[in-house]
């Protein structure tokens, strides 16, 4: 079973999580930029964060055999802080980067005029950079937030099939589906959506254009929720093809609209290939996790991955 | 032993009509040569090229020949246009110069395997100086920073690029550390920083083969020998293996060191 978590904040997660995700079958993730829990006070801290999503975090993911891409944006909450809004001027030079597969997460938090402006501006940026957009729906006043979101999307230059509406639930799924957008569901331990409700929605609305994510972050969350949904789908009568569609092919199709998805994990080779121009031909163990050479760390990781045959694969 | 692969995740990729972008999966440009699902090298990886030239030592002409032989036609055409643009418009125009945009998109155009070489070539074509290289580095992804480090020895004759090398050596990203210890570092890093770079390679598992001019700089370096023996003693005391590369470098430091007894005599 191959799994793609299309919305997870790995910066907030440990290497144990990476290992468990790999063992569960996760081979690709998309990490949207978001609010860090502690408010930022300047564009500079956004830029360091973006750089981390394009540098250190994909390196970490690659060490665990997981392909890492990101979506970049000014998040809705901080769009309300005038000290942060200037980051919008820096976004264009980031949106051209290879690993950026969408603009996001954007959308509404408190549905303020400042959020209107940031959402509309960033949908235009997505269209200008031929990128899809990851648009989340607010936690509070969700249905009204969805409707206002869809209005702004329809007024934008971005086609609806380039938009993923996330954090949907029973009250918002129908209107979101009717809009023609892609449908995202965040499965959390105790809020938003759980596995049983997710499977019920899949039964009622079908697997077309549906993406399931863990949205795991620094809050109470579970980076293995994609696997748990897959298992429950199988137990409830969906077949392997349905599971593969929802948990692999749909996210690949959506983010693939960027033309920038690279699902081969090639980066660790750079370590043991030295600086030969003939990278991509593994010669043997070496490199890998920092600060532990003697034991052949990369080899150990590869062994562990090799031994942990993906359950159900 | 090979890294885990996710190639099976792109079904149909091998049969797509357009090898650059697979419409069935939406995956971006794929490398012409690379690694198959089971980790065995394919394409260029098995061709007779001895592979002795490195990104840091190959001339632009060699790099171009290498890429031209390996890229498919759409990627080759893209690279040709990108290099022509960079030659014609090397400066900064508007918020971002055209060649810097090409640097950013080299991965999806040429595939991750060839992106480093393509970026180094674009930097050459644009005659990027130390200021331009700093800008590309500090505004770059990990992959772009790596390419800047590989380009440094060709494009910056003086020590102005050292802050980039020092920045890369502070990271724990082994791809950056590997690229940082090339000929530019050999030429310009002072003794203290260079010794720490060698030690960092040993710590992070970067093969010391990546360290340019290692034989020459390590020769008769008694301070490096002391650092290596202390590190070996620390590993031994902890019951952990001493990296084979450590003994190799210790041997290069020559007379004072006794590789067979690394934990003693050098307090
Ligand atoms: Zn999120």
What function would you assign to each model-found segment?
Chain B
Residues 1-126, 194-267:
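N-terminal alpha-helical scaffold/docking segments in eukaryotic complex subunits
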Residues 116-118, 122-227:
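Eukaryote-skewed repeat-based solenoidal scaffolds used as protein-protein interaction platforms
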């Amino acid at each position: 079973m191959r799994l793609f978590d299309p919305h997870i904040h790995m910066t907030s997660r440990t290497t144990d999580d990476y290992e468990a995700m790999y063992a569960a079958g996760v081979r690709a993730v998309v990490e949207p930029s978001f609010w860090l829990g502690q408010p930022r006070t300047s564009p500079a801290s956004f830029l360091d964060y973006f750089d981390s999503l394009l540098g250190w975090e994909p390196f970490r993911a690659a060490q665990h055999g997981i392909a890492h891409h990101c979506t970049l944006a000014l998040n809705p909450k901080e769009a309300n802080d005038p000290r942060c809004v200037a980051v919008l001027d820096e976004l264009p030079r980031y949106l051209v980067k290879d690993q950026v597969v969408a603009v996001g997460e954007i959308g509404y938090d408190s549905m303020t005029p400042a959020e209107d402006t940031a959402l509309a501006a960033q949908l235009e940026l997505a269209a200008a950079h031929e990128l899809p957009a990851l648009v989340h729906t607010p936690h509070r006043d969700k249905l009204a937030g969805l409707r206002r979101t869809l209005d702004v999307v329809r007024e934008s230059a971005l086609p609806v099939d380039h938009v993923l509406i996330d954090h949907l639930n029973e009250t918002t799924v129908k209107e979101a589906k009717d809009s023609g957008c892609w449908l995202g569901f965040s499965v959390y331990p105790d809020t938003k959506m759980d596995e049983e409700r997710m499977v019920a929605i899949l039964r009622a609305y079908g697997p077309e254009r549906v993406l399931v994510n863990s949205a795991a972050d620094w809050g109470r969350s579970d980076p293995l929720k994609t696997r748990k949904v897959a298992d429950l789908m199988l137990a409830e009568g969906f077949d392997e093809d349905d599971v593969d569609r929802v948990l692999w092919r749909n996210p690949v199709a959506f983010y693939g609209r960027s033309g920038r998805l690279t699902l081969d994990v090639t980066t660790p080779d750079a370590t043991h290939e030295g600086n030969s121009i003939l990278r991509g031909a593994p010669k043997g163990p070496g490199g890998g996790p920092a600060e532990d050479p003697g034991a052949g760390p990369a080899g150990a990781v590869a062994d562990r991955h090799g031994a942990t045959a993906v359950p159900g694969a | 032993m090979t890294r885990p692969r996710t190639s099976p995740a792109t079904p149909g990729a091998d049969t797509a009509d357009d090898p650059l972008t697979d419409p069935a999966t939406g995956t971006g440009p794929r490398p012409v040569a690379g690694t198959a699902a089971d980790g065995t090298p394919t394409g260029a990886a098995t061709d007779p090229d001895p592979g002795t030239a490195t990104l840091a030592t190959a001339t632009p002409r060699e790099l171009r020949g290498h890429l031209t032989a390996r890229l498919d036609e759409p990627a080759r055409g893209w690279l040709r246009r990108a290099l022509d643009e960079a030659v014609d418009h090397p400066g900064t125009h508007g918020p971002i110069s055209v060649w810097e945009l090409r640097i950013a998109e080299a991965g999806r155009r040429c595939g991750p395997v060839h992106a480093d070489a393509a970026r180094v070539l674009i930097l050459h074509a644009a005659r990027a100086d130390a200021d331009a290289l700093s800008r590309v580095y500090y505004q770059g992804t990990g992959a772009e920073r790596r390419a800047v480090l590989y380009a440094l020895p060709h494009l910056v004759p003086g020590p102005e690029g050292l802050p980039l090398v020092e920045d890369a050596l502070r990271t724990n990203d082994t791809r950056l550390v590997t690229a940082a210890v090339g000929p530019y570092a050999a030429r310009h890093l002072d003794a203290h920083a260079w010794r720490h770079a060698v030690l960092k390679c040993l710590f992070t598992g970067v093969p010391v083969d990546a360290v340019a001019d290692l034989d020459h700089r390590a020769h008769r370096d008694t301070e490096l020998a002391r650092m290596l023996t202390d590190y070996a003693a620390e590993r031994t005391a902890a019951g952990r293996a001493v990296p084979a590369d450590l003994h190799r470098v210790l041997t290069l430091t020559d007379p004072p060191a006794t590789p067979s007894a690394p934990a003693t005599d050098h307090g």
